[in-house]
A protein has these predicted regions:
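Flexible "cap/lid" loop of the alpha/beta hydrolase fold
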Residues: 47, 83, 91-132
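Conserved alpha/beta-hydrolase catalytic His-Asp/Glu region
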Residues: 127-143
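Active-site acidic short loop of glycosyltransferases
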Residues: 2, 27, 62-64, 87
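Structural motif
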Residues: 4, 65-67, 91
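Conserved HGGG/HGGXW glycine-rich cap/lid loop of the alpha/beta-hydrolase fold
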Residues: 2-42
Length: 143
């Protein structure tokens, strides 16, 4: 039986973007949520709002603790989930987690409260303007 691993994607990239990586790990059974924070789970004030999405997935899909791997935003969400429910995790591998100072977190909270975070956060701007349709694979490879 294959070792089970859960993967949490980075902000702005659905989990399927990592399929080439997953294909290189055939010895593992890799589970994931395609788009964290969509559907009935939403970020209202903090990334911690998505912990129930992770824990609900684990409870529905795993009968024992699993290794979890998170990239960027996904790493942070998994850390919050592991903090709240360590019983669900064998361990956690965090790839490139964003670590934000108190000043930055405070500024982000104020901008969210004022409803201007999409206008002033560079990553949010890039994600909102990212194309999802391209003329060819060759075109994408040049980017």
């Amino acid at each position: 039986m294959k070792e089970k691993i859960f993967f949490a994607h980075a902000n702005g990239f659905p989990a399927e973007v990592y399929n080439d990586l997953f294909k290189r790990l055939p010895q593992f059974d890799i589970g994931y949520i395609s788009k964290l924070g969509h559907g009935s789970y939403k970020i209202r004030s903090s990334w911690k709002d998505l912990v129930p999405e992770i824990t609900d997935y684990f409870e529905a899909n795993y009968t024992e603790p699993v290794w979890a791997i998170g990239h960027s935003f996904g790493a942070v969400i998994l850390a919050f989930a592991a903090e709240q429910r360590p019983d669900l995790f064998k361990g956690l591998i965090m790839m490139d987690p964003p670590v934000l100072s108190r000043k930055i977190r405070w500024a982000m909270a104020i901008s969210q409260f004022l409803g201007i975070s999409d206008k002033i956060m560079p990553l949010a701007k890039k994600a909102a303007n990212r194309s999802d349709c391209f003329p060819s694979k060759a075109f994408v490879a040049k980017k």
